[in-house]
Curated annotation (Swiss-Prot):
It holds the Pfam family tRNA-synt_1. A motif ('KMSKS' region) lies at residues 615-619. The lineage of its organism: Bacteria, Bacillati, Actinomycetota, Actinomycetes, Micrococcales. Belongs to the class-I aminoacyl-tRNA synthetase family. The gene is leuS. One of its GO terms (biological process) is leucyl-tRNA aminoacylation. ATP binds at residue 618. Its main location: cytoplasm. This is Leucine--tRNA ligase. The keyword Zinc-finger does not apply. It comes from the Bacteria.
Amino acid sequence: MAHETPDTPGETYDFRAIEAEWSEVWEREQPFRTPDASDSRPRKYILDMFPYPSGDLHMGHAEAFALGDAVARYWRQQGFNVLHPIGWDSFGLPAENAAIKRGVDPREWTYANIETQKQSMKRYGLSFDWERELHTSDPEYYRWNQWLFLKMHEKGLAYRKDSWVNWDPVDQTVLANEQVLPDGTSDRSGAVVVKKKLTQWYLRITDYADRLVDDLNQLEGTWPAKVLSMQRNWIGRSIGAEVDFVVEGRDEPVTVFTTRPDTLHGATFMVVAPDSDLAAELVEGASEEVRESFRGYLERTQRLNEIERSTTDRPKTGIPLGLTAINPVNGERIPVWAADYVLADYGTGAVMAVPAHDQRDLDFARAFDLPVRVVVDTTQPVTGAIRIIPEDGELPDLEEVLPGRTGVALPGEGRLINSGSLNGLSKQPAIKRVIEQLEAEGRGRAAKNYRLRDWLISRQRFWGTPIPIVYDAEGSEIRVPEDQLPVRLPDTEGLDLTPKGKSPLAAATAWSNVPSPVDGSPATRDPDTMDTFMDSSWYWLRFLSPNDATKAFDPADADRWAPIDQYVGGVEHAILHLLYSRFITKVLFDLGYVTFTEPFSALLNQGMVLSGGSKMSKSKGGVDLGSEMDRHGVDAIRLTMAFAGPPEDDIDWEDVSPSGSAKFLARAWRLTGDITSAPEVEWKTGDEALRRVTHRFLAEAPGMLEAFKFNVVIARTMELVNAIRKTIDQGPGGGDAAVREATEVVAVALSLFAPYTAEDMWKRLGREGSVAFAGWRKADRNLLVQTTVTAVVQVDGKVRDKLEVDAKIGADELEALARETAGVRRSTAGRTIDKVIVRAPKIVSITTTPAP
């Protein structure tokens, strides 16, 4: 049965019939294939973050893809050769867990979901180049993951080590730091993450930390400021010094990193992280009593997550290690403690404690009655002349702020005291001097530290890229030769994928036991798979050469298309995917495969789609995209997503009106039935007022679209539709050339947001070809010159009338016209006009008083 939008007279806007017709055309003609390299048009690479195939498309996908498609369609209208591909991020835990639950191969679940999503994408009218479709779980794709790993291994960027890792006790696998949420839980399973010591593979992302921070400057203005800030904070570059403390009874010094080397004279004890390798080394030579105490404390520490350990209001705990360190600036002997508030992966795992000027150190000092020495007088100005306190001088008149008594640290800046030759200096001069002193004596150096840690890529699960390394009988690492790639995943028949804390691939003995590529002797494959963020770190390059069997991508194609001009996706990927992609791009640059260092020139983050203020989910009965499309039509959903507000804002589906969007589309579509002029009509003969509205839209909309003000452009399109309808019903009618011109402009504009409706309008207008390639028409500048303006007429501060007048009208003429309007006559009847202010051509203000 045909669908007719309610409350709309005239022709029936049957969105179901329209969708069926144009879906068939697009499937048959594949109009959005990317032309070959000989196409001389300027190029744009527009990419939406590819989805994980966990089920059908949801409302969040609907928003993101509607926005990304609008961008791609806009640049096609501007005459660009646009690359807009799609694929699936199809490895990962959800597929493996679903396969375990259902007793099937994860391939079966994954590819069934891909087919479901693909059909929904096609129904949604997305202008993808389907010939470039890829799936990261295809051996033809993950072969190049393995190739990239081998290249990094050759350069020393991939390495294996024993370390404490984040362990998900539910999914039974390790997590990168970035996959642990702020509350200490897994971003996948929600389980509380614990620490476990394992031998794992890492990528040296820290070698690129400075470049990753500094190159963010290239992205200012084209990436959201929030994302830039999140990446800077995550990398966490700190500038300071490394200071070497001699520990009595130990040959090697203990090096600590500090951002405040100026406060070295205030260091009264040292603290090491109990779970650090350093702590284990320090207690080796300690007494049995200390070692026993340490073992118990370490066990208690390992039951805590990093959030708990870092909480400032948690009571401080620790144990003395029975060791003494020597402060290099004053020779003072200070005790060495182990305490859980120090984390093993910050700096060297050891800190110099300056309790007077650091709250956590102060809390610890007060808990264990350790010395507190003030070395910064925060009451003194940091500029100007001040009194210098002698080296042996006492802190004057500061009883009430002494941290040891008040329990409140003094973290601010001021002048150095109790610091020998540094006395009287402010922070930066003191830092400079103490670093010079340390370097001269060989006891320290200027240094940087980073919050960022090397990328842990090992995963103890099946459904991922096998690591292309084998081990000989001695355990030596051997790279799988490139001509033996891909190392394919084995069949799951007879293989138990249930998480057991070790890689299920190790149980696949026929797969695991192989001859050594070096000499044919018995060897064993690495049983781990790669973090799936490896898959997505470079997928955008594979789209350039998706069917190339000889290389990951063609560097010539990369030069032609990359970097990506516009990337579209959620802010939830700010740290993980985006940071890793930036890292891998820089690696590929250093290896000579690409000529650029940043993958995404511009980034658009869309907000979330909510329901009643809450995030949607199937378990909570969230809105179903398929049902919404059945009810309102695809175009109405797409238009609603773009019209709801700025893209970065969240959309509450209860606050928007897809039915209203459907009514508007029906109204726009019916315009084509009222047009009687031929396609070749001379537009310049049409109604001038409507042409001015049309060409103002043509002139202003591109800038709005490039600034992602989609909602404003849609509002202006609605205004143009109203102007057309008014011209048809109250003006020269549907045969006027300007009506055809304006309606064609509406069709082109709607092609960005409502492609089915726009294509049907274009056909009904008698135009050949697809509206998607019709081109954005140039505005006639002569029609942008304002010849008339709306003058507002006020009486006693209230608007009583409006006049459409010549832009060059004089004050006297404008006043005379205003006095004759019906609104002014009514408002001044029985009153005396005292004063008239005229600001031609826009305002007339009349002031009255009651008549005598």
